[in-house]
Amino acid sequence: MEGSWRDVLAVLVILAQLTVSGSSYQIIEGPRNVTALKGSEARFNCTVTHGWKLIMWALNGIVELSLTSQKPIITSNRFTSASYNSTDSFISEMIIHNVQLNDSGPVQCSLQNSNVFGFAFLSVQVMGTLNIPSSNLIVTEGEPCNVTCYAVGWTPLPNISWELEVPVSHSSYYSFLEPGNSLRVLSVLDLTPLGNGTLTCVAEMKDLQASESLTVNLTVVQPPPDSIGGEGQALPTWAIILLAVAFSLLLILIIALIIIFCCCCVSRREKEESTYQNEIRKSANVRTGKADPETWLKSGKENYGYKSDEARAAQIASLPPKSGEVSLPEQRSSLPQQELDKHRPSPVTHPRVSFDIASPQKIRNVTIV
């Protein structure tokens, strides 16, 4: 009985010693963050003081590797260990082989009976593929063309650039996500080649010194003879816009000139018609004035010194005839009577001559004021 109690007491003492001794161990330096490429290896180091009894490695909260002073305890072939001793510390290394995307997460290093832990984070990146629709491109010399490079299956999305081994007069490129597919990025190269060469699309990982490239051949041919000076010499966009604006302004100017010309013609015709009508009116007025002089007299003043011919004739007729006055027969006698007088013998008397002064010719003067 006493022997059994002694054995139990010895075990308790040993456990107490392990607990006390284990609690005095420390982690000097924990693991550091690692970014690894899918399919590669990831290494984590944990530095502790001497005298340790048990070191445990956990990934995403699951212990994948344990290490005692005698040997490591391995739960998976993807996880192995290495160790390094120094004068004042011990370094334990956990190696993760063939890293997968789902391995991304926290990594923990801990000691038995210790509340001190070392933490790090594992980031896994995936290198996808590059694709250019044609590996041999044939373009026309001096004509703009574009080449598209597709990056598919990259995590995270890469940075895409171009390497040109061909003489060009102009080159530029831009990248963007494919609409409807956030895991596919496109890069478009615009260039104007002048000779043969190669084009290389390069995709680089953001946090790793890793890249993928794809090269295509570019063959430049001469433009066909019928296109020289024609389609091959197409005007730039700014020149086409300038010509369109110039033609529009010219058309507007022509329309305005036509409108002005028509207005001038109509105005001139109306003026000629108005002048012609005025001339007609003047001619009519002149004719009317000649035919009806009373209209002229109405515009003048009355001459009170004027006497009519009838009044003078009546005054002269009332005077008695003077002696020795000879009167001629009136001209109003008929022609037969005159013939008879010619055949009759006339008495021998002195001829008598009379002058009709009753109606001398008068000139009527009108004074117009």
Curated annotation (Swiss-Prot):
Query: Where is it mainly found?
Result: membrane
Cellular component terms per the entry's GO annotation = apical plasma membrane; bicellular tight junction; cell surface
* Disulfide bonds listed in the record: 46-109, 149-201
Which intervals lie on the Extracellular side per UniProt? Answer: 25-239
Give the signal peptide as a residue range, or say none if absent: 1-24
The protein's GO terms of the molecular function aspect are:
PDZ domain binding
Segments on the Cytoplasmic face: 261-369
Give the highest taxon in the source lineage.
Answer: Eukaryota
Establish whether keyword Transmembrane is in the entry. Answer: yes
Location in or out of the cell: Apical cell membrane; Cell junction, Tight junction
* SMART domains named among the record's database cross-references: IG
**Which keywords, in A-to-Z order, does the entry hold?**
Cell junction, Cell membrane, Disulfide bond, Glycoprotein, Immunoglobulin domain, Membrane, Repeat, Signal, Tight junction, Transmembrane, Transmembrane helix
Tissue specificity field: In kidney, it is found in glomeruli and in the proximal tubules (at protein level).
Transmembrane portions of the chain:
240-260
| Record's bilayer topology term | Single-pass type I membrane protein
Q: Which residue stretches belong to region Disordered?
A: 321-354
Q: Name one GO biological process term.
A: cell-cell adhesion
Q: What does this protein do?
A: Provides, together with MAGI1, an adhesion machinery at tight junctions, which may regulate the permeability of kidney glomerulus and small intestinal epithelial cells. Mediates calcium-independent homophilic cell adhesion. In testis, it may function as a cell adhesion molecule rather than a tight-junction protein. It may participate in the adhesion between spermatogonia-spermatogonia, spermatogonia-Sertoli cells, and Sertoli cells-Sertoli cells.
Q: What else is known?
A: It may be a useful marker for injured podocytes in puromycin amino-nucleoside nephropathy (PAN) since its expression at the apical surface is altered.
Quaternary data: Interacts with MAGI1 at tight junctions, forms a tripartite complex with NPHS1. Interacts with LNX1 isoform 2 via its PDZ 2 domain, it may also interact with other isoforms containing this domain.
- PANTHER family, per the entry: IMMUNOGLOBULIN SUPERFAMILY MEMBER 5
- This one is known as Immunoglobulin superfamily member 5
Q: Which organism is it from?
A: Rattus norvegicus
What are the top taxonomic ranks of the organism?
Answer: Eukaryota, Metazoa, Chordata, Craniata, Vertebrata
Gene name of the encoded protein: Igsf5
